[in-house]
Amino acid sequence: MGEPGFFVTGDRAGGRSWCLRRVGMSAGWLLLEDGCEVTVGRGFGVTYQLVSKICPLMISRNHCVLKQNPEGQWTIMDNKSLNGVWLNRARLEPLRVYSIHQGDYIQLGVPLENKENAEYEYEVTEEDWETIYPCLSPKNDQMIEKNKELRTKRKFSLDELAGPGAEGPSNLKSKINKVSCESGQPVKSQGKGEVASTPSDNLDPKLTALEPSKTTGAPIYPGFPKVTEVHHEQKASNSSASQRSLQMFKVTMSRILRLKIQMQEKHEAVMNVKKQTQKGNSKKVVQMEQELQDLQSQLCAEQAQQQARVEQLEKTFQEEEQHLQGLEIAQGEKDLKQQLAQALQEHWALMEELNRSKKDFEAIIQAKNKELEQTKEEKEKMQAQKEEVLSHMNDVLENELQCIICSEYFIEAVTLNCAHSFCSYCINEWMKRKIECPICRKDIKSKTYSLVLDNCINKMVNNLSSEVKERRIVLIRERKAKRLF
């Protein structure tokens, strides 16, 4: 049996058996039965079928073979797998038998780029049967029988097949619509001074001096001296100045409302672009982002104009205060105060509307930025997946669909009676010298053209680089020309 450290067959009746223990897991162990050949791969005719969830093509159809030599020692052989078999961190040569011992480390395949370890790592060990049995991986024939039983009992309903489904409009859209509806309500002048408590950050700090009193709820005005009398001409002059101020506020209010309508239209456009961004329309996203920036600039300009009008209003108030000094009429004072109070209420209503519009616009910009980031991440993920699929497809073409004679992808694939496939031109040239299969050396009795294999190769080549396509076209033309001569 060799040295004590060699990996030799255990006696299950004695309570101990040899197995490949899955590193870091209490399941998926592979039992090595005495006198049995153990094959591992992703195909159907193996002892243990391993199907990678991360990379389906990591494990070949018949990846490796484990069996005993005449002395009873277990060995492992790489059966020409794509990603190789590793014994103690060293890759094995294909079709060469290696002895394995207690504590040896076996790795099937290679780690992915973002992983440190491979998905299938095992350690050669001998354990008690009671310890091994709960952790064993089911054999392929057992899994087939189990799947047949489940398939006869399985019934799906529409409710089971229907997932949570696509949700309705996004929370972001409903939230923005809610804010827009709130800000779109008509502004009513209230005597209690219910105005925005937080002015815009871009406004002049002087405006805070006009903030309503928190205790009384009424606006606080600069000191107005008591007036006892006024001439009719002076009263008319002061009234016309107040009317002009009110007119200016009304014009500003109409501009703000127009700007809000533009923001609502832009919001609808953003939601429409959201659907287009899912299809990869990045140009439309960039254009919409530029339009949003232009709208923000327009809002800032309107805010600056409003600040200038407020300063002009303060100047008007000071001038009216100077005119009112020394005037002695109670009725004129009362009328003027009412007009000034109304003007200030409209001013604060305008400021509140401006703040709401600013918040709505900032919410739209934040939502758009978030959507752009998500779109970029999804595009990068899709590109990475596409490159991975092309890489795997190229590996499959190179390892499974190449002619062993010319080392090119099959051109007019022909399958012999021994089930090996070659190019039609290559096997015809070979048969001029020998009437036997180049791989298994069996006599060639029949040849069958495989149209399915040709169509599959042509479709897969269409997804490869232009160099591969051009080379294949040149080879097809050369072989057709040689066939004519």
From Swiss-Prot:
Reactions catalysed according to its record: S-ubiquitinyl-[E2 ubiquitin-conjugating enzyme]-L-cysteine + [acceptor protein]-L-lysine = [E2 ubiquitin-conjugating enzyme]-L-cysteine + N(6)-ubiquitinyl-[acceptor protein]-L-lysine
Record CDD domains: FHA_RNF8, RING-HC_RNF8
EC number: 2.3.2.27
Phosphoserine: residues bearing it: S157
SMART domains per UniProt: FHA, RING
InterPro entries per the UniProt record, alphabetical: FHA_dom (IPR000253), RNF8 (IPR017335), SMAD_FHA_dom_sf (IPR008984), Znf_RING (IPR001841), Znf_RING/FYVE/PHD (IPR013083), Znf_RING_CS (IPR017907)
Protein's cellular compartments: Nucleus; Cytoplasm; Midbody; Chromosome, Telomere
Tree of life domain: Eukaryota
Function as written in the Swiss-Prot or TrEMBL entry: E3 ubiquitin-protein ligase that plays a key role in DNA damage signaling via 2 distinct roles: by mediating the 'Lys-63'-linked ubiquitination of histones H2A and H2AX and promoting the recruitment of DNA repair proteins at double-strand breaks (DSBs) sites, and by catalyzing 'Lys-48'-linked ubiquitination to remove target proteins from DNA damage sites.
UniProt protein name: E3 ubiquitin-protein ligase RNF8
Species of origin: Homo sapiens
